[in-house]
Amino acid sequence: MTALFPFDNSYARLPSHFFGRVAPTAVEAPRLIRLNRALAVDLGLDPDRLESPEGVEVLAGQRVPEGAEPLAAAYAGHQFGQFVPQLGDGRAILLGEVVGRDGRRDIQLKGSGPTPFSRRGDGRAALGPVLREYLVSEAMHALGIPTTRALAAVTTGEQVIRETALPGAVLTRVASSHIRVGSFQFFAARGDVEGLRALADHAIARHDPEAARADNPYRALLDGVIRRQAALVARWLTVGFIHGVMNTDNMSIAGETIDYGPCAFLDTYDPATAFSSIDRHGRYAYGNQPRIALWNLTRLAEALLPLLSEDETQAVAEAEAALTGFAGQFEAAYHGGLNCKLGLATTRDGDPALAGDLLKTMAENEADFTLTFRRLGEAVPGPDGEPDPAAVEAVRSLFIDPTAYDRWAGGWRRRLKDEAGDAAARRQMMRAANPAFIPRNHRVEEMITAAVERQDFAPFETLLTVLARPYDDQPDFAQYAEPPEGGGRGYRTFCGT
């Protein structure tokens, strides 16, 4: 019989100080909550075998599968601006890598027991955070945003002790890699240039193979990471996503959203929104995410200085030149995304101001971010040049002062006259850019409460079904598109895992 996972491991071939070898710790009574069968097929795996007793034992960390070389990766990181020279995988174990339809992917267990980097922790994960990451990462994938994926969630039959006793769980996470900005910082902080070079060469081979042919491969690697992060954060903003804990150890060089601990989505639009209970000063607020991304990338550039050039002055110049490109790349991606949300297929000089005026009006009038843009798509002028009155009223109703929307909408309709194409095509373009369904924070909390307190996973399954088609109208699930009463004010998230 073939192996459950056809592992082809590369990170485990790196020097031994890149990680600690550690096996998952067995649990009492593993039970499969859900297997992502479609993802399993994409990875070249047999979903029926993964759902078998043997497969569930592997997904729970009960059994180490053939070909696995389990390890916990070492990394450092800035956490809320403060540097910690050693962090590492404290509750996650990389089983190995497989090569599927979309290339090489890591298979990692989160919550599978203590590692050399657990820092007195138990290495376990609670059920609520596991379900949150499964749900939100799969929702982000459906939204078209680069992200780690969830292959499976398993309950352990054990409790984990946090503020209270909670049911334990294990998440099987899939990622293009788990190399972080903090991975490079780990070696830079130790003056380990050879370790830094080995990691960079591995990253180039895995994520930027064309960089190997560049005049300065390490500058090309840095450019690639900057480009991917600029595009990623722009996409976050266009769907109202707030990561919540953008520490350098939570930034993937692959350009995927990773580590969903205290994540959330905007309800009422306010760029100062920060939901995380530990982000007391709003460092990682919604509107601050581009600035923090650049701050993190600057830390990456600093770590790479010894590789950019043997001449320190030249190395700094290379780093600064690379970092200078972030703003333009982010702005192009962000405003391009906003133009799509407004039904604008072409670009004009005044477009950023038009979008900015709408966002300002939304903030002043406490309008819901997702609903405003979705309903705007139904309020585009028709073939006769006039919008549907009912559709216009549906948008206006979201604003405290509907006339404020009217004042903005006049300029928007004038701008639409510059566009070619008919109203139906424009409406379709906007529907593809403006989701009807996001993981509404209150719905996520209801789902977690049902699972943790009543062992009821039906809300989890329903949300997964709805969020798999975020851009489609789903009349039977219309309630899942609605914001909470009060616009979600006072909502708080917790790292949890």
From Swiss-Prot:
Keyword hit for Kinase: no
Catalyses which reaction(s): L-seryl-[protein] + ATP = 3-O-(5'-adenylyl)-L-seryl-[protein] + diphosphate; L-threonyl-[protein] + ATP = 3-O-(5'-adenylyl)-L-threonyl-[protein] + diphosphate; L-tyrosyl-[protein] + ATP = O-(5'-adenylyl)-L-tyrosyl-[protein] + diphosphate; L-histidyl-[protein] + UTP = N(tele)-(5'-uridylyl)-L-histidyl-[protein] + diphosphate
Pfam families (alphabetical): SelO
Residues binding ATP, per UniProt: 88, 90-91, 110, 122-123, 173, 180, 259
Keyword check for ATP-binding: yes
Highest taxon above the source species: Bacteria
Keywords attached to this entry: ATP-binding, Magnesium, Manganese, Metal-binding, Nucleotide-binding, Nucleotidyltransferase, Transferase
MF terms (GO), sorted A to Z: AMPylase activity; ATP binding; magnesium ion binding
Cofactor(s) annotated in UniProt: Mg(2+); Mn(2+)
The protein's Enzyme Commission number: 2.7.7.-, 2.7.7.108
Function: Nucleotidyltransferase involved in the post-translational modification of proteins. It can catalyze the addition of adenosine monophosphate (AMP) or uridine monophosphate (UMP) to a protein, resulting in modifications known as AMPylation and UMPylation.
Family: Belongs to the SELO family.
Name this polypeptide is given: Protein nucleotidyltransferase YdiU
